[in-house]
Amino acid sequence: ILQNLEQETGCHVLLAQKAFSMFSLYPLIGQYISGTTASGIFEARLGKEEMGKENHVFAPAYKEKDMEELVQICDHVIFNSFAQYEKYQHYFLQQECTASAGIRVNPECSTQEGHEIYDPCGPGSRLGVVKSEFPDQLPEGIEGLHFHTLCEQNADDLITTWHAFEEKFGSYLKQVKWLNLGGGHHITRADYQLDELKKLICEIRRKYNVRVYLEPGEAIALNAGYLVTEVMDIVHNGMDILILDASAACHMPDVLEMPYRPPLKDGYLPGEKPHTCRLSSMTCLAGDAVS
């Protein structure tokens, strides 16, 4: 699916390593996509060493000692603010530098109702530069723009975000070479609107003549495995509570942080069957449960 997307649209698909970093599979994954993207120096090294294709990085801020290495091992380095870019601009203006610098923008368009903790466009977000902070002319050396606003979402939300981005930042695309649409695209999900995504990418490339990148993470390995656990005991307190030898906090942190209810094999929603139970863990954290 991802290889076909690249072939039909000319886009570049990158593995977001924060979602799936089983590097033993990188040679296989690399047969179908263009490379990796990282959230810091260690992931950037991993992508360079284990896949060895296009290697991109974004972080809210960079340390000087890391930047010295990143400009050598990464093809794109994306900054979260103009102040951060100006601090390291001298690297990218050197003739021998092959890394391309970009700026992350905040389109100020939220499409994640109920998942505020994962919403980069929420009030007070630290991620990306808002339009009011943008200069009329991009600083010398900036060659691309990046936005990342989605999480496990379909193409319709990307299209909504694109319209907001284009309205605020479309004029800047004439000053750059590439546009990164970030991650959160559930491209390999059965109901994903793949044709709509292809149309959007082709339209962006035709209208603005820029290279287009996408950074799916979970979509690279969606439904590729299971968490297998054992029921150790059943306690009763208003309902049946199963004590498992697994932990939401340790093994499924998104369950507590989003919060998120993972699918259970042969499971149903509460009330759909005669018996309803809660899955909990062997840890001492009272709220370590799947609700």
Locate each region found by the language model:
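Short glycine/threonine-rich loop-to-helix capping motif typified by GTGT followed
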Residues: 154-160, 188-197, 223-233
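Charged (often Lys/Glu-rich) extended helix/loop segments that serve as interaction or gating elements
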Residues: 200, 214-291
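Active-site-proximal beta-alpha core segment in soluble small-molecule metabolic enzymes
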Residues: 11-178, 192, 200-203
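Flexible loop/turn segments at secondary-structure boundaries
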Residues: 22-24, 151-154, 186-189, 220-223, ...
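Glycine-rich beta-alpha junction loops
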Residues: 105-109, 149-153, 185, 218-220, ...
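A short, N-terminal amphipathic alpha-helix
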Residues: 2-8
